[in-house]
Amino acid sequence: MKHDLKHIVCIGGGTGVFAVLHALKDRAHVSAIISMADDGGSAGILRKQKIVPPNDLRKAMVALSANPELAMEFEKRDDAGFALGTHVIVGIQQKKGLEEAIREVSLELKVTGEVIPVTLDLVELSAELQDGTIIHGETKIDILNS
């Protein structure tokens, strides 16, 4: 790390965060603290299998990658809608754990900065509405805002 670079911490897990990470990767040392509440699409399928979905972690690592060719491969999707990178991370995760999967994939992608999950456990985002109703799941909460 160059000493003249600023250290910036980004917290989140949506499309905007990944665009910010990509824009900052050559201008600062970036630590990305990534939400683990994604439950849509392939992440929802992984959750049903009791696997912590690494989708947003993958996107953050790709955004911070200094290996653009491999990063592009990681984003290619199979017929079920899973990104190749998700398959790779889950494969390592099931054998060695999520932390080791992040470490190994970060090395292969030549990630500049750090990608840190907010938790290593399966979690569910919930929201309490003004009327006291509790909504569970990121996708259900997102629907309320559209």
List the predicted regions and their residue ranges.
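Electropositive, gly/pro-rich neighborhoods at or near active sites that engage anionic ligands
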Residues: 35-145
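Gly/lys/ser-thr-rich phosphate-binding loops in alpha/beta enzymes
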Residues: 1-51
